[in-house]
Amino acid sequence: MPVCRWKPEHLGLFYGLLGSMLFACKGILIKLAYRHGVSTETFLGLRMMWAAPFFAWVAWRSDGAALRRRWRWRRQAPAGMTGHSDDATPRADSVWRSGDVWRVAGLGFSGYYLASYLDFLGLQYVSAGLERVLLYLGPTFVLLLSVFWLKRPVSRTQWTALGVSYLGVILVYLHDLDGSLQVNVPLGSALVLGSCLSYSFYLVGAGEMVRRLGPMRLTAWASLVACVLCVTQALLVGGADMFRQPTEVQGIALMTAIFCTVFPLFLTTASVNHLGAGKAAQVGMIGPVWTIFLGAVVLGEPTGGLQIVGTAVVILGVLILSRAATRA
């Protein structure tokens, strides 16, 4: 019986599409949870509480063996030698350097705690479709940070892509400004854009550490930092309320943690390994379209010509930007 073997490119395409579509469901599930009256802090704490064991497993897979070697060495080393840092110590072959713990903590705060918190807050005021389109501006924020912070040159094509992307966002924004659709579109948009900016700082600041630690190790440890912050915040704000939520809210939080947080991480990483970062990013362009479709079907969010055209324009702008970055 013949065995069907997928080519690496086809596997990468499948992983990328599935990961993008799962991640695009996040806003839909959060909106469903809000219908049960749960607070932002409580639901975010629940999501990260359920996700923490998976990130801890990845972190242990990455560094568990090295930690065990170091612990055994400390037990067996002569008195007064445990602080010595010559080539005989387990630290000598470690990818971690002095100060990395604080760098990872800062990246976890910016990229996974603050970005998530602002995003969850923003979804109280804007549609899931607008939220996804605004988050899709991430590459343009990274470009602007590279210009004004890192002083890197930008080509005319990149500036064109920037203008096209923001034109599309304006169109989608105008669609959501209909008073019958949302509560406070300007506030919600500002919060989601703040989330996007916070995550862009993470992307710009994580470059050297990603190359040295690897994407999975860095993501796991930074996410664990965010898990601690989110759960602590939920307990400080609501006490034990996060443990007294109805089954529906607990189930939605678990689904958000597994299917919209953990799985997309592994699938996107696998897609990048098979396709490369440029092509994987282009595959991810299905995200905003899928969110708008689910918003209409699951949440009953109205769609319109401005939203559809604006989303297409944003995708075009990001596509131009990603291709320009690939050629650079």
Whereabouts are the PLM-identified features?
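Juxtamembrane helix-entry segments on the extracytoplasmic side of multipass membrane proteins
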Residues: 7-13, 37-41, 45, 96-100, ...
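Specific alpha-helical transmembrane segments that line the substrate/conduction pathway
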Residues: 42-53, 111, 116-153, 158, ...
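Transmembrane alpha-helical segments that form core, pore/gating elements
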Residues: 19, 31, 55, 142-144, ...
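Helix-helix packing/entry segments at the starts of transmembrane helices
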Residues: 20, 45-46, 130-137, 203-228, ...
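Hydrophobic transmembrane alpha-helices of multi-pass small-molecule transport proteins
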Residues: 55, 145, 154-176, 230, ...
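Specific transmembrane alpha-helical segments of multi-pass solute transporters/efflux pumps
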Residues: 22, 27, 62-68, 73-135, ...
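Cytoplasmic-side transmembrane-helix entry/capping segments in multi-pass membrane proteins
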Residues: 16, 100-104, 154-166, 213-222, ...
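Glycine-/small-residue-enriched transmembrane alpha-helix faces in small-molecule transporters
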Residues: 1-46, 51, 109, 121, ...
